[in-house]
Amino acid sequence: MSSAICPCGSGDLLLACCGHYHAGQPAPCAEKLMRSRYSAYVLGLTDYLVQTTLPVQQAALDREAIAQWSAQSTWLGLEVESAEVLGGKPEHAFVTFTARWHDGNGEHSHKERSSFVQNQGHWYFIDSTVPLKAGRNDGCPCGSEQKFKKCCSAYVI
């Protein structure tokens, strides 16, 4: 494992790249978090994928489905097209990427523009497949103590 190349496509060793984040060090930016999440799919690190999703969405994630998809796929690569840091308090970002994999149904390519939010020194993926149950004037689910309409509502794709 110490000489394994990181699956995220950086060309660095896993331990010097995404391995830090898998071991508990917070990712310094949304792009690094997204890359570490791709690596987690490759490595079957379901707990990491759940922990790096917005905390209010974690209970709704299907851990078994995540683990099965991870295990049943041969991961072919990741290409990051762009990372847009939008600033603000809390800080928000979009990362556009394409992930490729092969499974029992053939080869697949998925392009996505993912949303991220930083709270208390940690970046989190905002999962667009898990509804955020918040009205515009409710507190934001990211934990920022701002109203949803002033915080994450514009970043939920």
UniProtKB/Swiss-Prot annotation:
Highest taxon of the lineage: Bacteria
Annotated family: Belongs to the UPF0225 family.
Name used for this protein in its record: UPF0225 protein PSPTO_4127
Species for this entry: Pseudomonas syringae pv. tomato (strain ATCC BAA-871 / DC3000)
